[in-house]
Amino acid sequence: MNDKHGATEFGLVGEVPYYATIFTTRMTSNLDGYEETADRMAELVNAREGFLGMQSARGDDGLAITVCYWRTEEDIAAWRNDLEHEIAQDEGRNRWYAQYTVEVARVDRTIGFRRPS
């Protein structure tokens, strides 16, 4: 979990509304260069205006889900159109992803619970 603005292991705790992009992928067997590119994208996204945090999970079956939290839809669009990110997207389509979906959701409410230690 990338903690930038009140993000927790289970999501973002903070001022609503905000937006979430949900990137669900099924990987191919060709992962050459993937980790390096993913690390670079994480570095870049952390520097973006409006980026609030990220969480990811990956299964042994190649299914991966990454949720990024954003202040506005304009911030999401700016990231989508970042030149280095666009190049990485092309690489993903050409080499690493068998399939993917991107969903964008507005978060109007968060509810959480944590058992005291």
Label every PLM stretch briefly:
Residues 1-63, 73-81, 97-117:
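Short S/T/G/P-rich N-terminal loop/turn motif that feeds into the first structured element of a domain
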